[in-house]
Regions:
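Loop/turn-to-beta-strand initiation segments
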Residues: 426-430, 455-457
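Conserved phosphate-donor/acceptor-positioning beta-strand/loop module used by diverse small-molecule
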Residues: 452-472
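Conserved ATP-binding subdomain of kinase catalytic cores across diverse folds
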Residues: 17-223, 228-304
Length: 520
């Protein structure tokens, strides 16, 4: 019997289980109705306060759920992987049994014929893809998300094994083989064949760095399927669930490749500021040199993630009809074009934004950063944040006078420049956000840019005194300790630079940001 016939028979055998699970009387609580959600590899049945996940009897290029034994193993694997991180969601693995009377039951006596993961239900509007559509991914929630991902990666088992980066080869190979189909389905033309060649070249060129990061412990048992639909808000905190369970090679990966899926998902949805904030907060701690240098891999990782989404869409195209087929073809085209754009970012540059306290430096820096350089935008290095890291202080803790002494100020500027010197060679842009009151402070970033061979832009923000005073008075929970007295002292003793671009920052932040964009 052919493989296709075996798979058809497996699907036919499972049809009775699916019909059983659609009946309200099949469940202990007898819900009024049963809902159903279908994905490539699973059917999820929504019954009252619980959800039951059934692995579909399918065999695809990247997964094999064709027998009950394989479905049991993968259910147990998914439960073991996700329960530690989402204990409030994952309840147990449960058999669908057939009794002596031939009837199917949940967890009843008789022979197991299929397997389910029993989960707590949650409101759909708590999924992060729904929060994104509703415009509810604010800065505070993005920070929580970055911290949740960082905790997940910190707790993940390290795999220092030679299969990485070799395991990326088949993934890239599958993408390359799919390119002609993507060209045809998305009506792009022959452009994706050139992309396929470039993707292979990047993998070859990055082998040494990929291996070095593996040896440094940055290849771990990651989530593997980290996008917005697999994150839910539980008790006000992001909860990662549905980690990839069917192929260890797809999950034993570089932590930055894991994060890249989430960054790409945000970027593809047009949430550029959110993607930028996520990456910046993920790296807001003091990172090791190998972590910074790994940023050179990010364009490749992001591009590969987008190309894989195009390939997965191509797999589903034969089953789509009518308007759904046209929509899927458009989505494939979007992902393919995004993959191509992500692989070849603009070159790096160094930008210094100076000005007295209250001129809006940090707000403007965050506003323009997503539009600058490699996706998801320029790294913003802020002196107030570096000062707190240097002194081990939290964001709500007011620093003492010694933190602002000349030696401390010089040390803060050195930290800014050291981090910029680590980031710029990876191809990413950097924005330095500091007052830059002293001439020697302004000379240092320019000298760094010249040493690294990247363009430099110095911007000096100016605003009326009353505007600056109003802004510092309105700050809440900000990293800066500056108040009205600081602003007044700065006004008395600061001479603006003559060789930086002066920008009027008295208007709203977006208007000031528009002025800076014209300089870029």
């Amino acid at each position: 019997m052919s493989r296709a016939a075996n798979i058809r028979d497996a699907a036919a055998d499972q049809a009775a289980v699916i019909a059983f699970l659609m009946l309200p009387e099949s469940y202990p609580d007898r819900p009024a109705e049963v809902g159903r959600i279908d994905t490539h590899g699973a059917a999820i049945f929504l019954a009252g306060g619980l959800a039951y996940k059934l692995k579909r009897a399918v065999k695809l290029a990247y997964l094999d759920f064709s027998t009950p034994e394989k479905r049991k193993a993968v259910c147990e694997r998914e439960f073991a992987l996700n329960r530690p991180h989402a204990p409030k969601l994952y309840r147990r693995v449960l058999a669908v049994t057939r009794g002596d009377d031939g009837a199917l039951r949940l967890g009843g006596p008789g022979e197991p014929v299929d397997w389910l993961i029993e989960m707590e239900r949650f409101a759909d509007d708590r999924l992060f893809d729904r929060l994104a559509v509703a415009g509810r991914l604010d800065a505070a929630l993005i920070e929580k998300l970055a911290e949740a991902v960082e905790r997940f990666h910190a707790a993940a088992p390290v795999f220092n094994e030679p299969r990485w980066p070799a395991s990326l080869g088949p993934i890239v190979g599958n993408v390359v083989r799919a390119m002609s189909g993507i060209d045809q389905a998305a009506r792009i033309g022959a452009g994706m064949q050139g992309y396929a060649t470039a993707l292979q070249e990047r993998l070859y060129g990055h082998r040494a760095l990929l291996s070095e990061r593996r040896d440094a412990g940055l290849v771990r048992r990651c989530h593997g399927d980290l996008h917005l639909k697999n994150i839910v808000l539980i008790d006000g905190a992001p909860c990662l669930f549905d980690a990839l369970e069917f192929d260890e090679d797809l999950a034993r990966i570089d932590v930055l490749y894991d994060l890249a899926f989430l960054l790409m998902d945000l970027w593809h949805r047009g949430l550029k500021a959110e993607a930028h904030a996520l990456l910046n907060h993920y790296f807001s701690r003091d990172a090791a040199d190998i972590e910074w240098r790994g940023l050179a891999l990010l364009p490749f990782f992001l591009s590969l993630r987008a190309a894989i989404r195009a390939m997965v869409g191509l797999d589903g195209l034969p089953l789509a009809e009518g308007g759904k087929r046209a929509a899927l073809a458009a989505e494939i085209r979007d992902y393919a074009q995004l993959a191509e754009a992500l692989l070849s970012p603009a070159p790096p540059m160094l930008i210094a934004i100076g000005g007295l306290s209250g001129t809006g430096k940090s707000t403007v820096a965050r506003a323009i950063a997503p539009d600058i350089g490699a996706t998801p935008g320029a790294f913003v290095l802020r002196s107030d944040v570096e000062r707190r890291l240097m002194h081990g202080a939290g964001s709500a803790e007011r620093l003492g006078a010694d933190a602002y002494a000349p030696e401390s100020r010089n040390a803060v500027y050195s930290r800014l420049l050291d981090k910029a010197a680590a980031i710029l060679p990876t191809g990413h842009c950097v924005i330095l956000d500091a007052v830059f009151r002293e001439p020697h402070q302004r000379e240092r970033p320019k000298a760094l840019a010249e040493r690294l061979g990247v363009p430099f832009l110095g911007v000096w923000l100016e605003a009326p005194q009353e505007r600056m005073l109003a802004r510092v008075a309105a700050r809440r929970g900000d990293a800066s300790d500056a108040d009205a007295s600081v602003v007044l002292r700065q006004l008395e003793s600061t001479v603006p630079p003559s060789d930086w671009h002066k920008v009027d920052a008295s208007d709203a932040a977006e208007e000031t940001a528009s002025k800076l964009r014209t300089l870029l």
